[in-house]
Amino acid sequence: MSSRISVAGVAHRGNNILVMRRLPGGSVGGLWEFPGGKAEKGERPREALIREWKEETGLEIAVGDEIARGEFHHKGVPITLIAFSVELSSTDSDPDLREHDAFQWVNPRQLSRLALVDSDRIVADVISRESA
């Protein structure tokens, strides 16, 4: 079985990073995450990230370097998570709350204290090590 691709984007504002809390309900309801989602069939990871950010946050981004990659399983399906740094097109805009009920800009050292979606721990661990 081939692995599906999931993408996440890490945006900075000063020294802080954007995290968003999923709406209540479902397996990840109420947990914090880096905005992103699953790539559609035939969609490249960077294209998927741009689309997902627009759908979830209403924000337009430029996708930068890959910063983390890891594997996890969701309902028995192997998924490859690829995280990229992203730059917001408008640095003074806040995200819309479409699939989330809250957002915050956090210092990377605070990531370990948040109730993050399990798959995003891969990304948080890389960010925490780099900011130590």
Enumerate the predicted regions with their spans.
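Conserved beta-strand residues within beta-sheet cores
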Residues: S6-A8, E60-V63
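Conserved acetyl-CoA binding element of GNAT-fold acetyltransferases
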Residues: W32-G37
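A conserved beta-turn-beta hairpin within the catalytic core of GNAT-like acetyltransferases
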Residues: G26-L31
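Conserved N-terminal beta-strand and adjoining loop/helix that marks the start
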Residues: M1-L18, K38, R69
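Unchanged
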Residues: A39-A62, A68-I122, V126
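Generic C-terminal helix-cap and adjacent flexible tail
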Residues: S128-A132
